[in-house]
Amino acid sequence: MAQATITPTLRGDTFASTFTEVAHSNTLGLRNNEQLRLFHLSVQNNHFDHTALVKFLKRNVGRYVFSRAEYEGYKQRDDLEEVALDAVNRMRSQQDGMGLGEILLYVLLEQILEAPKVMSKIELNQARGQIHSRCDAIHLLTPDGQRTTSSIVFGTSSVVGNIGDAITAAFDRVVDIEQNRSDEVQLAEHTVFTKTLDPATASCVKDLLIPKPGGAPVFDTAYSMFLGYDIGLDAKNYDNQQYRSALDQKMQVDIAAHAQR
């Protein structure tokens, strides 16, 4: 039987012009599959291009904040002009200080890992009852040519000035999520019986997490972290080409120093 899947929500056609990937050869040394990817914003005249980032986020903030069912409602009402403003207002009403990290976590999970959103942090906050989610996102990674089992991906984000502090904070949260993994899975299960998910996504999550009579659910859990930190370079000390090279080299050195600590 074909593996059920859910559709991506991100509009990522301008991702490559907004973010620049930095090549490196470091790994975390894990037994299971892993990805360790480095990105920075595109650079113009020794400064990060925040204008491109803002435009990219405006295109996607509604897709991040609202469930597929809610977003489809805007389409049916021919009211997509209101999506971004309504999404920002909902984020402000729930803001916990980590909004940028959470939305960039969503972007990278969908664009790079190709793991569609099940629930964002905003949706988790909306849906929670007696169960408090410790993660910033729940996404679904389905089988491909190498993976034979689906994975529920629990995401967390950490945006602080120092890379070491960002890593420590993120891993502390992963440990907390792992220790309460059954609660996180149960929260995902509960969404199937609410109006939070659209019918197609609810059916996919139900098939994955809730065993049929005489059967058992077959899925793994995985973790994803988004880390944001201050690069610590003084742009005045470099010409344009030197700055781009120094930026890549600094990030390569940073990840090499922390990858397998």
Residue ranges and their predicted role:
Residues 118, 126-207:
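Glycine- and acidic-residue-rich phosphate-binding/metal-coordinating active-site segment common to enzymes
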Residues 168-260:
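Acidic, metal/cofactor-coordinating or nucleic-acid-engaging core segments within structured domains
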